[in-house]
Amino acid sequence: MKTYTYSKQDLSFIEQLSQAYCKDPFSYLGLHQAGDVSVIRVFLPEATTVKILSAVGQILSEALKIDDSGLFVAQLAQQYSSLNYRLRVGYSLAEIDLEDPYRFTSSLLPMDNWLLAEGTHLRPYEILGAHLKTQEGVSGVHFSVWAPNARRVSVVGDFNYWDGRVNPMRFHAESGIWDIFLPNVEKGALYKFEILDSNGNIRLKSDPYAFASQFRPDTASVVTGLPEKIEVDAKLRHANDPDQPISIYEVHLGSWRRHLENNYWLNYEEIANELIPYVKDMGFTHIELLPITEYPFDGSWGYQPTGLYSPTSRFGSPEDLRTLIRKAHEAGINVILDWVVGHFPTDSHGLTEFDGSHLYEHQDPREGYHQDWNTLIFNYGRHEVFNYLSSNALYWTERFGIDGLRVDAVSSMIYRDYSRKDGEWIPNQYGGRENLEALDFLRRTNRMLKKEGHGAVVIAEESTSFAGITHSPEENGVGFDYKWNMGWMNDTLRYMSLDPIYRQYHHDWMTFGMMYQYSEKFVLPLSHDEVVHGKCSILGKMSGDCWQKFANLRAYYGYMWGYPGKKLLFMGNEFAQGREWNYNESLDWFLLGEQGGGWHKGVLNWVRDLNRTYQKYPALYQLDYDPAGFEWLVVDDWQQSVFAFERKAKNGESVIVVSNFTPVVRHNYRIGVRQDGTYTEILNSDAAYYEGSNVGNYGEIECEAIESHGKPFSIELSIPPLSTIFIACQPKPKEAVEAEQDIVKMAEVAMQKALKPTKKTVSVKAKAHKKAHKNKK
């Protein structure tokens, strides 16, 4: 085959391949029929020679280089409908044997293609992205990506010297997906997609479905296997239920602790070995991780992700993260992931204008640009975008064993006019401000997780009064399991910042939350958002001098742990870190030593005991979302800033919580209670153990049959200054109550008998009356 006659097809593809805009390479490259013979076409720009080998290494043909761009054509002696062949490629310095990617058929099944086009594939991550697989006995990686408006897409990496001309992909017009199987590419290989967009611009993009990514500032995706599914113990998922104690420790992995010698992060293994025992000892039931999906900028704390399917490489591999979660589960601790699906950054390697069009985002900046964060907003109305985001929830719960997702910035998702002035937003189809597509996305995702998530919960960070966030979609709700109670947090922190002298005038700030308490299933959050951007630490928000600040904080935590709703505390708050959180430094653990003067250790001990008491007494959690579980005992003592309420369990057992938000001891303070029994002070924030002044009730408290606050019984307390105390009631046994009732009845009968006049008494009285009447006459 020394001479070659060029066809129109040859000339067309020579131009397309050499100029790197070939959209249909499989129709030309690889094995094809040409009249009575078969030909194999190969495009390798740097090659000097190409030979065709049989499966056993026999040379079947030597290809002719028909164009200097690197196009080779080999004619075979007979026709083949299929052929297991290899390439022996000569380069200037070596000759190597290669598999030809263009001899392999697509592994994208018609049903998958159809479901992906429709946006209804439950697990698109099992198809899209980079998947290690064996095809026709050859191991390699199947790559696929959605880029419907691209003119050409190629996989590039170390395996082809990042040359976009070498491996153009197959285009599926019905779904907009490109795919190719690259033989002999192995786990750990770096890759990107080189996209020729409709405007003729080259874009180098990370894989939206990548399961691993390079460490910043590098941005390539990393070939790794799709993690195996994880079966989570039903007992752990049951711990997410509304009638269970949920106390969440919110953690930023990059700054919880660092290596002292170089201020560098702990890795996933080190975090597991230190964080989990600490959380267990502190009595928290859940860990909430600030976003760990891959993100380019440390200062975003993870809230501007570029790889939703890729755990950040800052702390190790995806398998290392799975190990951390497994160890948490072994310790009986559930793990919640902060999930950012409201926006994404404008980094050029990410989703922005992915194929030259506004593929993942809205084109109009009034819908697609978030001016507060300089980020782009997902187009939830597009089926493929919906599918990309919704399936990600299932990916984390199934493949990593995540027990819950906390959805970030829900308000910015569901309102089209969020943080926008008039004229800066586009109304929905009915002229309203609600983002109907975002609401539909949230409802359908929550419904899907209820069905497929095996007990994983979804929590909304939603800062407005949008109705029905935790109601089911069938009730016209959004379907979340829990919602952060931002209103309660803001009101109570404002109250605690006041000098105690002025608190009496704002008594309702501590009680108003009960007006809407049962409208949603609330979590009480003291999150990272409250200790950044000049807001100061939680300790810094408390009023008073040093002693008062710590006393106020302990009292406030006590009020919070007693109040209905699940609990969330950001790291550092458990020991009253004095300065704002800094993502680039470790927490101030030294404060728990001598430098902290004992104050911080006292708060740490208080939070630990709050958590343990919280888990011990079902009255403090079982009926968080049932009005039967809460009753005000003292709600109107605004002059003394005293609050008292009773928490009740399903079996009727109760715990009374009393708070005094002034620095004045309230001696002989009587509180009405509904039942007789033994009352015991079980927690006191003013105890010396917590660095308080040690005023208290010291054990059992006498219950008296004295009416107070509309109750038949009452107890008299000494309420310490700036404190919260917890009092448990052990009702008298039924037999004792019945015996007392019998004694009372017997006494009443005896009294009635003593007062009833006898016949002799009546006769004497009658005679005396008759004599007195006679004398009067």
From Swiss-Prot:
Pathway(s) served: Glycan biosynthesis; glycogen biosynthesis
Keyword line: Carbohydrate metabolism, Glycogen biosynthesis, Glycogen metabolism, Glycosyltransferase, Transferase
Biological process according to GO: glycogen biosynthetic process
Keyword Acetylation applies: no
The keyword RNA-binding belongs to this UniProt entry's keyword annotation: no
Any single Gene Ontology cellular-component annotation: cytosol
Active-site annotation: 408 (nucleophile), 461 (proton donor)
Enzyme class: transferase
Coiled-coil residues: none
GO molecular function, one term: cation binding
Catalytic activity, reaction form: Transfers a segment of a (1->4)-alpha-D-glucan chain to a primary hydroxy group in a similar glucan chain
InterPro entries: A-amylase/branching_C (IPR006048), Branching_enzy (IPR037439), GlgB (IPR006407), GlgB_N (IPR054169), GlgB_N_E_set_prok (IPR044143), Glyco_hydro_13_cat_dom (IPR006047), Glyco_hydro_13_N (IPR004193), Glyco_hydro_b (IPR013780)
EC number: 2.4.1.18
Any single Pfam family the record assigns to this protein: Alpha-amylase_C
Family: Belongs to the glycosyl hydrolase 13 family. GlgB subfamily.
HAMAP family assigned: GlgB
Protein purpose: Catalyzes the formation of the alpha-1,6-glucosidic linkages in glycogen by scission of a 1,4-alpha-linked oligosaccharide from growing alpha-1,4-glucan chains and the subsequent attachment of the oligosaccharide to the alpha-1,6 position.
Subunit structure: Monomer.
Name of the protein in its database record: 1,4-alpha-glucan branching enzyme GlgB
Organism of derivation: Actinobacillus pleuropneumoniae serotype 5b (strain L20)
Gene of this entry: glgB
